[in-house]
A protein has these predicted regions:
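Secretory targeting signatures
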Residues: 1-29, 34
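Conserved redox-active cysteine motifs that mediate thiol-disulfide chemistry
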Residues: 55, 62-80, 105-107
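A short beta-strand-turn-helix
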Residues: 39-59, 83-84
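Short, small/polar residue-rich loop motifs at catalytic or cofactor-binding pockets
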Residues: 34, 57, 148-150
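Structural recognition of the beta-strand scaffold that forms the well-ordered cores
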Residues: 58-62, 95-100, 127-131, 152-155, ...
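Short, internal strand/loop/helix patches
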Residues: 97, 112-150
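Thiol-/selenol-based redox modules, centered on thioredoxin-like
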Residues: 148-192
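Conserved helix-turn-beta segment immediately C-terminal to the redox Cys motif
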Residues: 56-57, 73-100
């Protein structure tokens, strides 16, 4: 009986982390269809549509919120990551969008205020999308692609086709991941 109470307390304390992913996996995709589109407000209240980024290499960060410690860490490195992605290869332009699922406590859908606070806290310049449509998009995408949790990155090519997932933080996404997917995109164009 003495062990049950501490174990229950540990379970309760760790349950908010169940959506976070501590390991890493990367998967290249064999799809040829564009990703489903999403239109949702960003932290400034402006609607952003994912298909507007066609013609660029789009990196989408699927993120939770403050309750996910590794999500905080990832959000804090995105501006530097975006700069390194943009400066690596002049053959393409990189666009970056973050999809924020929850409020800081993980109890409700992320609002504009949550997205603005997240953006300011992380000192980011990219769009942070929020709201019911964003949460639905995250859940549908994770179900369809069997993605285990946050943070997760999706690299999308110039035609709007998903090229690769990078899930977790042990081997986080780097600028060269986008370059590799761009080269694979060019190779696929040559073969068709």
């Amino acid at each position: 009986m003495r062990i049950i109470a501490p174990m229950m307390m540990l379970l309760i304390l760790l349950s908010p982390l169940s959506g976070c992913v501590g390991d890493d996996s990367s998967e290249e995709l064999d799809t040829v269809d564009p990703i489903p589109d999403l239109t949702a407000p960003n932290q400034h209240g402006e609607n952003v549509t994912l298909s507007e980024f066609r013609g660029t290499m789009l990196v989408i960060l699927f993120n939770a919120a403050d309750w996910c410690g590794i999500c905080n860490d990832e959000a804090n490195r995105t501006e530097e990551l975006l700069q390194s992605m943009g400066g690596l290869d002049d053959r393409y332009t990189v666009s970056f969008v973050e999809l924020l699922r929850d409020n800081a406590e993980g109890t409700t859908i992320a609002s504009q205020e949550d997205a603005m606070n997240w953006s300011e806290y992380s000192n980011n310049s990219h769009s942070v999308l929020h709201g019911q449509a964003t949460r639905d998009y995250i859940e549908e995408t994770f179900d369809r692609e069997d993605i285990p949790g946050f943070p997760s990155y999706l690299i999308v090519d110039l035609d709007g086709v998903a090229r690769s997932w990078v899930v977790g933080i042990n081997e986080p996404i780097v600028a060269e991941d986008v370059q590799v997917q761009y080269d694979a995109y060019l190779q696929d164009l040559d073969q068709n």
